[in-house]
């Protein structure tokens, strides 16, 4: 049995292309603040700041590639940081997808743009971070510090062929990954165990 923890935390920073185009200085500052300390899994926001936004509306293949690349970035990242001040279905989908696979999400928004719907979500992996032009860097650092404590740790162990067969069967029957089944099983036991103080 061993536990592996990545030494280089990877961050996926994403925002609405429409908003990046309206305030390149802000998004440049956000990208630079994050990338000085952490490995970025995508430089898309940085490319938008430097070269402008690509219009994908007329290109079905480019849309598909953009979608697949976004999912890869979510999966690869340890933490997802989003700027959600504007109304965007894409940002809502990305946020939902990241939380679905248990990634900590920092959802940043300008002080005057509180996201009413997302603010109603009750997910321990979601960090809502209100910021101003003055405190954006500090808000990023404080939010990342919180998010680091929410990152799942990879835990590997050996099982018998019989247990593996059962896990495969459960996965197919219930349509859930083996790791999710095991996590849920352990969490149920934790709730039952009155001596556990974690």
Question: Which residues are covered by each model-predicted region?
Answer:
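Catalytic donor nucleotide-activated moiety binding site of glycosyltransferases and closely related
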Residues: 34-61
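A short, flexible N-terminal coil/short beta segment enriched in small residues
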Residues: 5-36
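Short Lys/Arg-rich basic patches
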Residues: 142-162, 168-171
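Short, glycine/polar-rich helix-capping loops at beta-to-alpha or helix-loop-helix junctions
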Residues: 112-120
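Amphipathic helical hotspot of TIR/SEFIR-family domains
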Residues: 86-107
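Short, basic amphipathic alpha-helical segments that act as recognition/interaction helices
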Residues: 174-198
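Conserved beta-strand-loop-alpha-helix hinge of the TIR/SEFIR fold
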Residues: 73-92
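Short acidic-hydrophobic, aromatic-tinged amphipathic segments that line or gate anion-handling sites
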Residues: 124-139
């Amino acid at each position: 049995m061993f536990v592996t923890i990545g030494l280089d935390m990877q961050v996926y920073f994403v925002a609405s292309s429409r908003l990046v185009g309206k305030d390149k200085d802000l998004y440049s500052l956000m990208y630079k603040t994050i990338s000085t300390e952490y490995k970025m899994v995508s430089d898309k926001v940085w490319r938008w700041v430097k070269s402008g936004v690509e219009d994908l509306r007329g290109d079905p293949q480019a849309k598909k590639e953009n979608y697949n690349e976004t999912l890869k970035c979510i999966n690869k990242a340890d933490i997802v940081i989003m700027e959600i001040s504007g109304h965007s279905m894409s940002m809502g989908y990305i946020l939902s997808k990241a939380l679905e696979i248990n990634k900590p999400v920092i959802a940043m928004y300008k002080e005057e743009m509180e996201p009413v719907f997302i603010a109603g979500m009750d997910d321990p992996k979601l960090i809502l971070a209100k910021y101003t032009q003055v405190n954006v860097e500090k808000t990023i650092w404080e939010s990342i510090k919180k998010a680091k404590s929410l990152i799942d740790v990879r835990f590997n162990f050996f099982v018998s062929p019989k247990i593996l067969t059962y896990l495969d069967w459960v996965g197919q029957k219930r349509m859930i990954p083996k790791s999710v089944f095991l996590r849920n099983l352990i969490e149920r036991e934790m709730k039952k165990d009155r001596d556990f103080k974690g």
